[in-house]
């Protein structure tokens, strides 16, 4: 909040603009009194050039979604003129360039509804929130439902802000490419409460879904209700939560999507990744794949990743698990890194495979 207010003070009564010239994309900011402006993208910093009262930067990317950090005189700020998202437990501005993908465009068609639900969890001992997407023009009763999880450092809003999952489904429904289904998006960064203290514990999501959220939300909206009308998918950390949940409870799900995804849980018990002091997880959920009936559990088992994803070696190493256990999967490698430029098409493709 402080950074956002700081940005408003610096840029009050000003605007930031994206424009094209000679086939190149530029970001233009009005910040007359600043001495220096720069933009961080990953590990690199790009300085703006001052042109009169304006600061101009040729954007070093052409992909659709890009998290950036704007710095004014060395101070990182959030620009209210640009979209704000979050990842890796950090707030970012992001710049979205047109990529010709009509599935992510808001069009004059019927749109679904997003509902924010709150409840007190007996498992985390904390207030939890999840978001329900209800497709347009159809009653929720009897619909299939996909439980869709975000990645580390994100939240239940990520799939409908930066991810545009609801817009993608609206467009696919309008085009007649999918049958309508609902989404439930939970906060996978589960914060277990102990008195006044909280502790991140991603493992708890599985119990919360199975014991609390699924019974509660499916009773209220009358969707799902059986294995054939229920699926689960997630990206990055959410893929870990997905794999563990569907392997431990194959009787509950018929569709599985593992985006930039992992079969093994490399977070639990890892001293560099897990804030809970516990022994390394023994991957007991993977024993479900030893069951000869495993392939009959799921209509769709999609595993995918970007070709420049830093986790690609881990993904490729897990190919051996698939081969060894004889799992029938759909495997796709997309162009891109560990970001929304991969996860959006992952989701769009997966949506067209499931509940058919």
How would you label these PLM feature ranges?
Residues 1-11:
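Short, Lys/Arg-enriched N-terminal segments with co-localized hydrophobic residues
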Residues 13-45, 49-356:
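Non-catalytic cap/lid and distal C-terminal segments of serine-dependent acyl enzymes
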């Amino acid at each position: 909040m402080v950074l956002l207010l700081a940005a408003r003070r610096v840029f009050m009564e000003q605007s930031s603009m994206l424009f094209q010239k000679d086939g190149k994309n530029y970001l233009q900011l009005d910040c007359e009194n600043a001495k220096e402006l720069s933009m961080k993208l990953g590990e690199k910093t790009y300085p703006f050039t001052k042109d009169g009262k304006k600061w101009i930067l040729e954007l070093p990317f052409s992909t659709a979604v890009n998290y950036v950090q704007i710095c004014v005189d060395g101070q990182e700020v959030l620009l209210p003129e640009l979209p704000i998202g979050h990842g890796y437990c950090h707030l970012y501005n992001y710049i979205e360039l047109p990529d010709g993908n009509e599935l992510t465009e808001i069009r004059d068609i019927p749109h679904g509804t997003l509902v924010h639900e709150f409840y007190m969890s007996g498992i985390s001992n904390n207030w939890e929130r999840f978001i329900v997407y209800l497709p347009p023009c159809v009653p929720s009763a009897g619909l299939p439902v996909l439980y869709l999880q975000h990645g580390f450092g994100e939240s239940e809003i990520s799939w409908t802000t930066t991810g545009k999952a609801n817009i993608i489904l609206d467009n696919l429904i309008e085009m007649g490419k999918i049958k309508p289904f609902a989404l439930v998006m939970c906060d996978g960064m589960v914060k277990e409460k102990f008195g006044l203290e909280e502790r991140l514990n991603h493992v708890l999501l599985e119990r919360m879904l199975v014991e609390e959220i699924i019974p509660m939300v499916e009773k209220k909206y009358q969707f799902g209700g059986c294995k054939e009308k229920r699926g689960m998918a997630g990206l990055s950390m959410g893929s870990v939560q997905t794999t563990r949940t569907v392997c431990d409870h194959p009787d509950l799900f018929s569709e599985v999507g593992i985006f930039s995804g992992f079969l093994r849980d490399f977070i639990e018990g890892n001293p560099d990744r897990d804030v809970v002091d516990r022994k390394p997880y023994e991957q007991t959920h993977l024993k479900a794949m030893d069951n000869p009936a495993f392939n009959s559990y799921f209509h769709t088992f999609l595993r995918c990743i970007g070709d420049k994803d830093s986790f690609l070696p881990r993904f490729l190493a897990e190919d051996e698990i698939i081969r060894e256990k004889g799992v029938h999967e759909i495997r796709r490698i997309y162009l891109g890194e560990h970001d929304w430029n991969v996860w959006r098409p992952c989701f769009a493709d997966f949506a067209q495979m499931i509940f058919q």
